[in-house]
Amino acid sequence: MKKIALKNAARGTAFDYAGQSWILLENDDGRALCLSKDIIETRAFDEGNCNNFAVASSKEYLNGAYLDNLLEDVNGPNAFLTTEPDLTTDDGLKDYGTCTVTIFLLTVDQYRRNRDVIPNADDWWWLSTAFSTKSNGYESLARRVDTDGTLYWYLACYGLYGLRPACYLDSDLLISIEDDEATDDVTPEHAGEIIAALAEQFGGTFATEDQLTTALSFMLGTLRATREKEARHE
């Protein structure tokens, strides 16, 4: 096992945090979108059959008792970040706006964007996106993911579909992974950091191509040394 920062891990990397197993879906501007590796339990999207995640009973549960349990199992700094998921419906209506949460269900867009690294589950599970809205005659249909990964919809009050929580974590969080899971490639985030450091050191210009190559090699060497140091302090 070795420790690396979440921002240095490859998409699809599985890791444990706060007593639960997560999958890294994507890194974005200092935060990492993560999905529970498994369905945690079966529960209605909303016990009142409302497909608006902003007021759904599943949202209240995930950000209440469930989040409290996660925080109790945090060993070290709390890396959970708040966010505002976009609740635009399947047909493009924006009646439901956004809501402020820490734990949430993936939107359809987040699911589609990261489908290539999301393993199928052994049961159906909810997304936070509604089929349409009450103003359009659909106040009860919410999106779900089937066991083969395909998308469907069903009544929000149905209590036999799973909750598969998602969250944003601070991308500087150190996680433990198997050695062969570590990425050897420079991620876009790393590349940006390298370019910024080079620009600061050389004023954004290089006299020759050799100068650029030398500086870049130095920065990459520093990055590798940092990773090796993290591994030694596992």
Identify the residue ranges that each predicted region occupies.
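Short intrinsically disordered terminal tails
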Residues: M1, R227-E234
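Short, leucine/isoleucine-rich alpha-helical interaction segments at C-terminal helix-coil junctions
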Residues: L87, M219-E230
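N-terminal acidic leader/helix
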Residues: V186-G203
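An amphipathic alpha-helical micro-motif enriched in hydrophobic residues
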Residues: I194-A199, L212-L220
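Charged, low-complexity interaction regions
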Residues: F202-D210
